[in-house]
Amino acid sequence: VTDDWYVDITTAKLIDPARRKDFKVFVLPNLYGDIITDEAAEFQGGVGTAGSANIGKKYAMFEAVHGSAPRMIKEGRGQYADPCSMLRASVMLLSHIGFQKQANALEAALDKCMLEEKKLVITGRADGCTCSEFGDYVMETITQMTK
């Protein structure tokens, strides 16, 4: 079933808990897609933690929702960028190409690191861990979980 909606009412209904579950797939031009995906990302932790997939008939692309964080680079904070968005996109990629076991392991490790243990905190600044430190934490967690 398909339905046509204006973007303004779509964004309003997306934050309505009673209607949110009605949305499964969005087909949108880039500008509206950026707006809707950023809004939807807030429900699971924000754009810093959301992966993105663009899947076509022949090709697919997986990326971080937040892009390359150029402002953080300009401000000298690039090493503190949140890797979770890219790692979530990697889960989607692994699943898409048939590596479901690896996708499940990475997703479980991310959930454990981000939501359960929280041994390292990503703040985007020097008071938090670096991208590399968090990546190492995730990899160590995968290793421990798959022993």
Please provide the spans of the model-predicted regions.
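Glycine-rich phosphate/diphosphate-binding loop of Rossmann-like nucleotide-binding domains
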Residues: 1-10, 22
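Hydrophobic alpha-helical scaffolding
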Residues: 4, 25-26, 79-80, 99, ...
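Glycine-rich phosphate/nucleotide-binding loop
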Residues: 13-105, 109-117
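Glycine-rich phosphate/pyrophosphate-binding loop and the adjoining helix
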Residues: 100, 109-147
